[in-house]
Amino acid sequence: MKTKVFLGLILSAAVTACLCRPAAKAPGGSHRPTSSLARRDWPEPPSQEQQQRFISRFLPHVFAELSDRKGFVQGNGAVEALHDHFYPDWMDFGRRSTEDAADAA
């Protein structure tokens, strides 16, 4: 019993010593190219000019994504076709009630 406790303490001390050391850097320094779009090494917040440049660069893309009519929320015919193929006997009650209302009109 004492041997197991002693080995456990030695093992935990060795693991703690290995985990506390800083990671060694690889020789040659694997340099990742920094992206001009995402800079996380700024010492201070971006200036007003930089904010305006980022906004003017990304705002059209955001508007294009938001105005896209083929979104998941509005439904997709391909998804409905797959659903009908894999679940032929399952009835969506919301869809059934809208179909019944359309048939009654």
UniProtKB/Swiss-Prot annotation:
It comes from the Eukaryota. It is found in: Secreted. Residues 24-51 are annotated as: Disordered. Pfam families: Gastrin. Keywords: Amidation, Cleavage on pair of basic residues, Digestion, Hormone, Secreted, Signal, Sulfation. Transmembrane segments: none annotated. The modification Phenylalanine amide is found at residue 93. Residues 1-20 form the signal peptide. GO terms for cellular component: extracellular region. The modification Sulfotyrosine is found at residue 87. Belongs to the gastrin/cholecystokinin family. This is Gastrin/cholecystokinin-like peptide. It comes from Gallus gallus (Chicken).
